[in-house]
Amino acid sequence: MKKYLMTFALGMMALSTAAFAGTQATNTNTVSPTLQISATIQKAVRLTLSTGTAAVTHCAVVNNGGNPDYTMNFGTVDALGINAGNCNLFGPANPGVDSAIYWSDYNLTPIFTGQSTSNNTITAQVTTNFTAANASIVRDSANSSTVPASAAAFTALGTASADTIAGPGVTSGTALTRFIGVAIAPTNGAGTLTGAQSATVTFTLTVN
């Protein structure tokens, strides 16, 4: 019985020494503890808007930090292009028939990390339209950084579905210049409104 107890005690001493072998040692001048590092990595996406730099004048993109995320104010506008607005204007080629287009450049910066592919697109859609029937959101038809030369360079931005305005294959972290505007039609009668109006455009970055 005594022999069994002695063997057990020695065994426990050996286990204790092994437990601390990495952090302390005797009869040596080096010790090598180990540290296991753990982290849960997630993929991430970001799409930011900012004031443009390409056109002659720019309507400021204001970061609200909430809902809506950004705002842009075109100022006072009219269908004949009498008011200058806050940025750029293409007056109607045929007043009383064609719309006046007030427009501005803006920048989009997509950033994505940890994705299994770099294929991506950016879309835009009017998700809340103007109440006024004589006002609509327009975008540059070319989807490029080239400054539009006339009203003909603009087309109505989609309301029922989103329009692709960049991609596929946009580079992460690179700002893109695009153009957006408000078209004021020379209409009269029911549904034609004046005064302050607003619409909401939703931009979507998809990496797939």
What are these language model-derived features?
Residues 1-21:
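Gram-negative bacterial Sec-dependent N-terminal signal peptides
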Residues 8-9, 145, 184:
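A periodicity- and composition-biased signal for non-globular, repetitive helical segments
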Residues 22-142, 154-157, 161-208:
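N-terminal small/polar-rich segments of proteins
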